[in-house]
Amino acid sequence: SEKDVKEEDLNKILEAGRVAPTSHNNQPQRIYVVKSEEAKEKLMKDFAYNYKAPCYLVCGYNVDEVWRNDLDGDRESGDIDVSIVITHMMLMAEELGLGACWIGRITPELVKKNLDIPENVKVVAVLSLGYHREDDKPSKLHTIRRSNEELVKFL
């Protein structure tokens, strides 16, 4: 629904993201809370679909604060760290009775430009947040699951 997200619920969701594990506990995540109509309008410029959510979390990381794995070509932890943070926030949202949708079909540079996000922050995804409508049902994409036999191999 378009009902505003309670500040108390939003703070619990953000806290779940803050305490989520990150590589070497570097905590490179940066979360931008988009609630004002003006900010939502700027964010929507990049969306193919209007989610009509009362709140969005633009999720990224400070590229200067990520851990680099020297055993794997200095691979950066940022995308993984932010994915863990987003997952923790989604789980908390669901626990509080909110729906959350991971929006990955974005143009990160355009989101950064439209919202004046600093150059040293890499935007990974946007999370929409809102309370479920009473008639909400999962889409077909969310009800079809593969079996563990297909996905897991015991060694």
Residue ranges and their predicted role:
Residues 1-155:
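Acidic, surface-exposed loops and disordered segments
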